[in-house]
Swiss-Prot record:
It comes from the Bacteria. It is an enzyme of class 3 (hydrolase). Its EC number is 3.2.1.55. GO terms for biological process: L-arabinose metabolic process; polysaccharide catabolic process. Completely inhibited by Cu(2+) and partially inhibited by Co(2+) and Ba(2+). It comes from Bifidobacterium longum. GO terms for molecular function: alpha-L-arabinofuranosidase activity. The active site is at 186 (proton donor/acceptor), 310 (nucleophile). Alpha-L-arabinofuranose binds at residues 39, 84, 185, 257, 310, 370. It catalyses: Hydrolysis of terminal non-reducing alpha-L-arabinofuranoside residues in alpha-L-arabinosides; (20S)-ginsenoside Rc + H2O = L-arabinofuranose + (20S)-ginsenoside Rd. Homohexamer; trimer of dimers. This is Exo-alpha-(1->6)-L-arabinofuranosidase.
Amino acid sequence: MSEHSHDNKPGELEESRLVVDNDFEVAPVNDRLFGSFVEHLGRCVYDGIYEPGHPEADEDGFRKDVIELVKELGATTIRYPGGNFVSGYRWEDGVGPRDERPRRLDLAWHSTETNQFGLHEMAKWLEKTGGNELMEAVNLGTRGLEEALDLLEYANIPGGTKLSEERRANGADQPFGIKMWCLGNEMDGPWQTGHKSAEDYGTLAASVAAGMRAIDPNVELVVCGSSSHVMDTFGKWEETVLEKTFDNVNFVSCHAYYHPELQPDGTRDMKSFLASGVDMDGFINDVAAAIDATKARLKSKHDVFISFDEWNVWYLNEEPSKNPEGIGNWPVAPRLLEDVYSAADAVVFGDLMITLLKNADRVHAASLAQLVNVIAPIMTEPGGPAWRQTTFYPFSLTAKLAKGGTVLEPKLASGTYETDKYGEVPTINSVAVRGEDGTISVFVVNRSMEAANDFAIKLPEGFALSAVEAQTLHEDDLLAKNTLEDQNRVVLHPNTTITSDADTGTVRVTLPPVSWTAVHVK
């Protein structure tokens, strides 16, 4: 539902309403929606999760302070090792004795890869972070079928073959049991090492999928969708690739990044940026339509879901994203893509999480790109501290409250506002999740830059309301950030405006302009 658009004077209070009904469900919340991504890029691995010699390093060189923050974040599935990096990666370089591992050029990020961290280290690190699931990507850029099958044999076969016995000799007696595999990365992107046409990639992915299933029928495979919604190849790529792979894959990937675009006058288009969830929602709907069209055309009974395995706010092509250059300049773990996120970025980030939850019937996996230092919720300094970026907070609280729950059909009445990029959009975006214990969690974002919003939640009939609480991320200074010098500048605060009426089953809370709020009702 949508109400008429109107311009607000600063300080004016808008109104919106969410009706929560237990009888209308979207889908269970898949734990994989709270995945993240570790790529050999910049300081994500080296000086990020792995820093031997750091005061907080354990016996394996893993930073214990980072491990604790990853646990607090609530990330689940971890996609690894790329990303663009994987399209030139030789997995066997990263196994075996460390002093025998080769140093290689990484063409994706113009860096040197030392290979001191590889598959075994990743598996061991994931055990320490709480047993997170590993989502492994195979190289379909410079490599193909044989190398992918070798990696699967090495990782998942218990023993008795050359490669499985090599794994055991390298210290992993039991197989890694990796279920989820990405068949390459962004293969329609001209920047991708080994970039391919849809025809060529679809044919290769189909053969790799069939071969992998011959080794391990229980693998879950992610085929590359187009690199983004705005690619010229988008749509036609999905149609061609899915036509060739449909019955042998489980997911098609989506990738999307958002930032406030610079205007000719030097300002940024904040109103459009704050509505980024609208674009993500349209992207998901378009990919779902491509899946459905292919399924109908093939008369298939098989279901393919979306793995939104790269999403975030990213100031793409701006200064922190510039690669090293020059034939003699291939640094190890340079500072790359180290965006420092603002309060406004965190609000948009929370909006994107709401959008993923609203589409939980189609999106069964998602990976926040990335986890540490590289466009990440966690930052570190070599030899120094680790801290939470602004985006850490909406992710961790959403994961805490939504895991194991069921998304309920959003019935939302909201005003609208005008944007240059997306036209008229709802001022409020919200979703409700019913927990396993029957409690209700509502996540809501106020996109308005001018007006606070009186947000009413109508609870399900017969809900025995006993307690309510709300936490809000909001700063009057939209550009406020958490930095090495001021690590807790932007945090969640209790929203003391929350009230409840058990007789009418209504909860009300005032949402400040440009804010993200989580309401928990029990």
